[in-house]
């Protein structure tokens, strides 16, 4: 599905810092400016040079909380969660899609997501893409033990699914320190059994424990020993799980 021509015509562009609170601030400000029917939204990660008629929005946490509260009250917490999920998409138009869908939902109800409305349709598709990639990584993500006993894993997702993965493993590994490194975005999330911290790092220094090195070799040996060469089917493997997701598997596929 493609946006109609009016989508690309000259219209105010709201430029923000790329954070979810920043996007919520845009929703508040654009509504106050009565520009909610025709606007574009860009984050600083997508656009480095401002044009003459761009509107730069500073993140306002109080306005963001008001928008959150209003969405939960007039729509639902589930709708807000869908916004958060869509926000993790790598699609460069996600910001504009979310904002327009929110405005329409506030007028017509969250049932708009079940319609063929262009923005709602695109938002649903982005949500499905994010959740699908998260599901794939839940199946292939491999933790390895570092010398300090922290469990470490590396991912290279297309979408920014690190926050969604952290919430899952935090519930599963409550008493275990772990870190997940998003190599694509040079971002790492660290859980110390109490809280999660997310920060940026280009290349973390890693030292595996002696036990990890031993078990990794044992696992590779086991994986090879149970494999029946005559029955290998790489095409079927790639059909079930694209090779893109094999990069950081301990075993040799």
Q: What is the predicted function of each stretch?
A:
Residues 2-61:
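N-terminal ordered "arm"
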Residues 22-33, 100-104, 167-171, 216-224:
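Short, hydrophobic/amphipathic alpha-helical patches that form generic packing surfaces
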Residues 37, 77-80, 136, 175-179, ...:
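Intrinsically disordered or highly flexible coil/loop and linker segments, enriched in small
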Residues 41-135:
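Charged, alpha-helical interface segments at or near domain boundaries
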Residues 57-63, 196-208:
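Acidic, Ser/Thr-rich peripheral helices and adjacent loops at domain boundaries
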Residues 82-86, 183-184, 232-238:
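Short coil/turn segments at secondary-structure boundaries
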Residues 111-200:
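Internal, well-folded beta-alpha domain core
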Residues 177, 188-189, 207-253:
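Long, compositionally biased intrinsically disordered terminal regions
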């Amino acid at each position: 599905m493609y946006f109609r021509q009016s989508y690309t015509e000259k219209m105010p562009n709201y430029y923000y810092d790329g954070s979810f609170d920043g996007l919520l601030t845009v929703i508040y400000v654009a509504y106050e400016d009565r520009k909610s029917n025709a606007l574009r939204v860009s984050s600083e990660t997508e656009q480095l040079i401002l044009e003459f008629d761009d509107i730069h929005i500073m993140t306002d946490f109080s306005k963001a909380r008001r928008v959150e509260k209003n969405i939960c009250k007039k729509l639902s917490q589930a709708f807000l969660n869908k916004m958060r999920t869509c926000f993790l998409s790598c699609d460069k138009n996600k910001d504009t899609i979310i904002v327009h869908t929110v405005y329409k939902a506030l007028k017509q109800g969250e049932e708009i997501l079940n319609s063929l409305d262009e923005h709602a349709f695109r938002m649903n598709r982005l949500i499905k893409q994010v959740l699908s990639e998260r599901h794939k990584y839940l199946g292939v993500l491999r933790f390895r033990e570092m010398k300090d006993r922290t469990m470490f894993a590396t991912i290279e997702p297309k979408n920014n699914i690190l926050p969604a993965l952290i919430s899952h493993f935090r519930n599963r590994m409550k008493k275990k320190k772990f870190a997940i490194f998003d190599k694509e975005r040079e971002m790492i999330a660290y859980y110390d059994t109490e809280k999660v911290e997310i920060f940026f790092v280009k290349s973390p220094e890693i030292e595996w424990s002696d036990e990890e090195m031993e078990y990794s070799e044992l696992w590779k040996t086991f994986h090879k020993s149970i494999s029946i060469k005559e029955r290998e089917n790489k095409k079927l493997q790639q059909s079930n799980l694209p090779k893109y997701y094999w990069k950081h598997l301990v075993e040799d596929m």
